[in-house]
C-alpha cells in the first residue's frame, strides 16, 4: 500500500489548524498508564486554553490512580476527516479556588452530577503540554506545533 498524499499545507497555518481542531472535537481520547498497561478513554474537557486542557474526574475513578502514579499523559483529537492533534503532557491537579469556580460555573454537567464545587470526589487536572503535533488526513507524518 502506498503512503497517502495529503493536500499541500503552508507550515504557517499549522498552529491555527491545530487549535481549530482542538476547539472542534468534543471528545478527545486520553491515554494514561496503569502499571505497564496503557489505558485509553474518551474524555470531555471542561476548559481549553490554547493547548492547555483541563479534565474533570472523580477521585474514585481508575484514571485518578493512574495519573497519580504517572503524570505523563497524551490526548488525541481526531476529526471526521482524520486530521489529528496529539498533545503530550503532564497532568497536574488544580488547587486554585478561583480557577475551579470558573470551571464549575461554565459546566452545567458538573453542577448537575456533583452538586457543588466542594464535592470531595471532584478533581480537575490541568494538562500542561510538553509536545503538540498535528497530522493532516492520513498523511502518516506529524508536524510539530509546539
Give residue ranges: language-model regions.
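A short, Trp-centered hydrophobic/proline-enriched beta-strand micro-motif
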Residues: 20-34, 73-77
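General beta-strand recognition
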Residues: 29, 52-54, 74, 86, ...
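Conserved beta-strand in the GNAT
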Residues: 42-44
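Acidic-histidine catalytic/liganding microenvironments
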Residues: 25, 70, 107
